[in-house]
Amino acid sequence: MLIRNIEQEKQACMHVNWYELFQKNTIKSCIIPVPEDVLAYLRQDMLILPKECSNFTDVSTGEGFQTTHYNAFDDQFDGSDGEEDDANEQPAFPEFSQALTDAIRSLGGCAFLKSDWHCPKDAQWITLGQSLCVRDITDVYQLLKASSFCKEDFRERSEVNESGYHIVLKKWKDIHPGSEFRCFVRNRSLLAISPRHWPSYHEHIARERSDIVNDIVSLFKEKIKDTFPLKDYVFDVYRPGKDNVIIMDFSLYGKGHSDSLAFDYDQLDDEALVATIEEEDDPEFRYLPNDCGIQPIKRNVYGFPQDFRNFFQGAASSSNGDTAGEASAEGDSNNLVNRLIEQCNLQQLHDDNQDHA
């Protein structure tokens, strides 16, 4: 049995290592190396944002774009009595923050954020619009600090991986969920295709099935198969229209690495053993042919926890009755509490609307 070198596979799937190979077939991106001091900050659990994320700072993000952003975290540390530890002092990363601002501006003022392998989808509840669209550095820092997925990417790595640590900003695009697909490659053969947002139903998929498969197969055979260095991997694509397929990402093949969505990895492995060259032109494409009713929304899995809602709502109620002399760490964090309660209310409103839709 062939022993996999997971570290080398992960390195191949890093955005920084495949972007130039497929630059003409993917979304414009800015890749920003993470300095050691920023990396140490991102690894910490503290919720202090850098000094550059100041209150009511106007951030010019390009022609026609002007963002005014209030940072609720900063007020936790205003009015310091001078006795707090150095560890609680607000950090500053002027050069890195400027690089982020310049990148967002160059991408038109809106960008999709990810680290080397993951996007902070588990933290989008913390943004005002509950979106992964970032418009300024406050959005970037808040998402990175709140995301367990990204924090995992910032952990110490094997010496095999010498590519460093990066923040990736992609030009923002409003993508219809029914136009994203996940493709499974085994032994350099395209075995299967699944809708990326399985098991959601999209009427046009059944109607355009042949065109979808043909377009993805063409991209794979002409651009990816002989270029991407791995034999087994998963890649995601976005198909905005006929004859137009855009590479979104590459990830590791197999259980524990990439969601198999409409398939099972054991089944895919069995099919790979008997696959023929001819079958590569017609990979199995699974999709819902009929509307099965309301399906669970995966985004809600990463929504604001109900326990947290109860805790912060209780903290806010008790803080309203505190006197100045009774203020504690909870009282010092009122601005954060209010911020999180606001997110609770926004999500509750969204959930209620979904229930009545």
Map each language-model feature to its residues.
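Preference for protein termini
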Residues: 1-357
